[in-house]
Amino acid sequence: MASLNENQKFWARVTELARQSIGKQAYDFFIEPAQLMSVEQDTANILLDSGMKKDYWKKQSDLITTAGFEVFGRMIDYELYANDELTDIELRRLNNQSPVDEPLSVAKPTSPLVSGLNEKYNFENFVQGPGNRWTLAAAIAVADKPGDTYNPLFIYGGAGLGKTHLMHAIGNQILTDNPTARIKYVSSENFVNDYVNATRKNQMESFENTYRNLDLLLLDDVQFFSDKEGTKNEFFNTFNALYDKGSQIVLTSDRIPQELNNLEDRLVSRFSWGLTTDITAPDYETRMAILLIKSESSHLEFPSETLSYIAGQIDSNVRELEGALNRVEFVARANGISIVDIETASQALRSLKNATQQSLSNLTIKKIQDEVANYYHISFSDLVGPKRPKEIAFPRQIAMYLVRELLGTSLPAIGTAFGGRDHTTVMYAYKQISDKMKNDMDVQKDIDSIKRKF
Ligand code: ADP
Ligand code: MG
């Protein structure tokens, strides 16, 4: 619970914002007589002098949200009470400021075990896209029938693409359905630390009690698992114990099981008993949807062209995408801007862009053409020549797309660089590949792999 001081600050800010945004008469009538009784959990309890003023206050959520973020740094909701409508219980509760005596809401059930779960990550706030569709479906299936459908579930993919998010979502869902479920989320590093501590302190029994009696083990980033013999052995035994009693195991990694050199084959082969599924980078639509959701909790206004601009800047990592949005928000706030325009966004992201441009500054059309030809095993002369079979025309379109995308070269100039083609041909190629980038995973992967070479 927040200290009184913070509550006062919060309320002062609410009234100040109100004074700035509404007329004096309305302020004196609706705002002035209101009192902040308490802030419990993330809810501000506000007492009005009359029930008829509730409707007006219901429309003032901006004041509360803004002040809440400024003072508490998080989303604050609010509950309205009116002097002329209060029951005795409510009045007592508000005056005592004691949520303990008369809890308004039933306490959330918690697992008897320290689960390590983060409630923030759930299925509802996970945006589905072509890059994560199957993995999301598998995760939902696992949460629905743990230990049944896909066991273990092995999720792999690059950094910041939602692997950890999905793990927590599975755990939270299972915990909601079954509040007594024994669940543990742990990074591989912490599993190793727990084990090392247990052996050092002679507490192996308690370690095994914890880990081998779980209903669900979520083990994150197994590529960081230590390759020490003892730990690996313990992991192997834990895995077997859990698997044998039908407990669900979910693992993540940045690579496929076969590439995990830190783990033994006998363990890696067990990973494939269940389902191995990957997450790839979000396409443009998914990035937009993620930005839309994340920007909703901001009290600034993000027009869609601004979000589109941000989505165009960061294309391979959701964590960075969130970081970019935060950065833009920060700069907008610092400049007192409430409707965030592209100009502000581009200013905020300039330093980010500089970093990527640095690595692209040596890039030339020729280099892109060479890499593409190389990637698809065709010759440079075919790539820019007149031949038109699919095996050549497709890489050519990819190369044109990349030149346009990465170098911003004009359409006619690209046409020239590709054997003197017309600019409409280039435009067509660009459109073809842009469309495919939205829903064709193979094309996304190709482009990703080629880009990584630069
Ligand atoms: P990973 O474990 O794959 O490195 P995380 O699960 O930590 O990635 O995701 C990084 C951030 O991006 C988190 O804040 C997560 O909530 C967010 N995120 C990733 N994918 C999505 C998605 N599809 N929808 C919403 N948020 C996402
Ligand atoms: Mg992670």
Swiss-Prot record:
Keywords: ATP-binding, Cytoplasm, DNA replication, DNA-binding, Lipid-binding, Nucleotide-binding. It is found in: Cytoplasm. GO terms for molecular function: ATP binding; ATP hydrolysis activity; DNA replication origin binding; lipid binding. SUPFAM superfamilies: P-loop containing nucleoside triphosphate hydrolases (SSF52540), TrpR-like (SSF48295). Gene3D superfamilies: 1.10.1750.10, 1.10.8.60, 3.30.300.180, P-loop containing nucleotide triphosphate hydrolases (3.40.50.300). The keyword DNA-binding applies. GO terms for biological process: DNA replication initiation; regulation of DNA replication. Residues 333-454 are annotated as: Domain IV, binds dsDNA. SMART domains: AAA (SM00382), Bac_DnaA_C (SM00760). Its main location: cytoplasm. Residues 1-77 are annotated as: Domain I, interacts with DnaA modulators. It comes from the Bacteria. The keyword DNA-binding applies. Residues 77-115 are annotated as: Domain II. One of its GO terms (cellular component) is plasma membrane. CDD domains: AAA, Bac_DnaA_C. Plays an essential role in the initiation and regulation of chromosomal replication. ATP-DnaA binds to the origin of replication (oriC) to initiate formation of the DNA replication initiation complex once per cell cycle. Binds the DnaA box (a 9 base pair repeat at the origin) and separates the double-stranded (ds)DNA. Forms a right-handed helical filament on oriC DNA; dsDNA binds to the exterior of the filament while single-stranded (ss)DNA is stabiized in the filament's interior. Domain I is involved in oligomerization and binding regulators, domain II is flexibile and of varying length in different bacteria, domain III forms the AAA+ region, while domain IV binds dsDNA. This is Chromosomal replication initiator protein DnaA. It comes from Lactococcus lactis subsp. cremoris (strain MG1363).
